[in-house]
Regions:
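Extracytosolic ligand-binding ectodomains
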Residues: 1-143
Length: 143
């Protein structure tokens, strides 16, 4: 981002989820992080489901900070495995695999999701805009 902006290239940037890491602003400089967008998995400002806000509040109470999108994904992953075990009534590898493959309308903190035939989660996402590295504007996009 810094090199691009130093070269006078001031077009919007659409990047991967990692571009939202606070280190990006530290490395690129705050002034170079405006007009940058990325798809995020979770936002406390744009809760995807009714379980997102209680999760975020409990996390902040326990750890003194907001959960990151990666924390939210990890939380959902564990809950999805739990749901698969419960749905298949087994802890075997094959049963968990089958349970995950058949997961439908799972209400996670990152969104309501179903697993498609190719084993990909189909769920909402958050479009996030970085503004001077410190602020963000989040919009929940449901699929």
């Amino acid at each position: 981002l810094k090199q691009m902006r130093d070269m006078g290239i001031n077009v919007p940037v659409i990047g991967p989820d990692g571009i939202g890491d606070p280190k990006t602003a530290e490395i690129a400089g705050n002034k170079n992080t405006s007009n940058v967008y990325y798809a995020a998995h979770f936002s406390v400002d744009a809760p995807a489901t009714k379980v997102a806000t209680p999760f975020a509040k409990a996390y902040k109470k326990a750890y003194g900070k907001e959960p990151s999108q990666f924390t939210a994904l990890a939380y959902d992953s564990v809950r999805m495995i739990k749901a698969a075990i419960e749905n298949e009534n087994s802890t075997s590898k094959a049963a968990i695999t089958k349970g995950l493959a058949n997961l439908k309308n799972f209400e996670g903190v990152t969104g309501k999701m179903s697993i498609d035939k190719d084993h990909n989660p189909v769920k909402s996402m958050v479009s996030r805009e970085v503004i001077q590295a410190l602020h963000r504007v989040d919009v929940l996009i449901k699929f």
